[in-house]
Amino acid sequence: MYLKKFLMTIAAALCMLPLSAINPQNSKMKELNVKKVSVTNIPVESVPALLDEEKVAFQPVNTVNWAAFPYTPDVEFRIAHTEDAILLHFKVREASVRAVAGHDNGPVWEDACVEFFSVPAGDGVYYNMECNCAGTLLIGAGAGRGNRQHAPQEVLDKVQRWASLGREALKKE
């Protein structure tokens, strides 16, 4: 079994309010209070140590959204924010990994990936960020699944990413 641990720092102020998520299995809201940390220009590879120092706890991700895909890897994340960035740290354990999408805004959803959703303005427009285990990123924004627009490369280039498996696509087996 591989341990994959990847981390991405979202270098934009997307959401400074407490985050909430609905668990469709039991329709209960889970509220997370996102801690503000006072740092600037932190190297992305230093984020796990910073979150350790700030005692930011990991939260489990244990909801299966699609009955057709019942497999659930062991996933946990932690989140904090600075004045101008959201810091995300994901740890994922699963039986096998895949990272074939080798360029941003590619089909990372076909790889081993995690997602982060945010509605920063409360206006119904949400941001969907998907990152595969090699740090390849897809960012879309829109009011629904069908009409999201992908972020331009100059925005994607501002997102700092680090992956414990490295940043190169993993070859298909």
Name these PLM-found stretches.
Residues 26-173:
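Structural preference for beta-rich elements and adjacent junctions enriched in aromatics
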Residues 1-29:
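Bacterial Sec-dependent N-terminal signal peptides
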